[in-house]
Amino acid sequence: MNFNDIETMVKSKFKDIKKHAEEIAHEIEVRSGYLRKAEQYKRLEFNLSFALDDIESTAKDVQTAKTSANKDSVTVKGKAPNTLYIEKRNLMKQKLEMLGEDIDKNKESLQKAKEIAGEKASEYFNKAMN
């Protein structure tokens, strides 16, 4: 074997090793990106859990207010004040009912968002590990 043959063989092996190293570096970069995305989705899921807790607390407060609104705690002598009180109480009940419905819708939306964030976190984590 002469020097040129050896040189050609070494250069060929170096190119193969360099190509393989570039492929590995690219794979590491891609998987690192997946891990970053998985971490971001996990953090989002965690934050959405707190938001859900806040909404559930608010929903309980609204439910308590609705229950309290149904109780007649004020008695006013005379027809006009009673009518005004009843109208305002009914308006308050209606607004509390609407608020409760909005809270339920928001709660459902947050729950879906939390589930999707959890699924995405798992998806990207699995991509990074496979």
Curated annotation (Swiss-Prot):
GO terms for cellular component: extracellular region
Keyword tRNA-binding: no
Keyword tags: Secreted, Virulence
Subcellular location: Secreted
Protein family according to the UniProt entry: Belongs to the EsxC family.
Subunit structure as annotated in this protein's UniProt entry: Forms both homodimers and heterodimers with EsxA. Homodimerization is calcium-dependent.
Protein purpose: Implements its pathogenic function during infection.
Designated name of the protein: Type VII secretion system extracellular protein C
Gene (name only): esxC
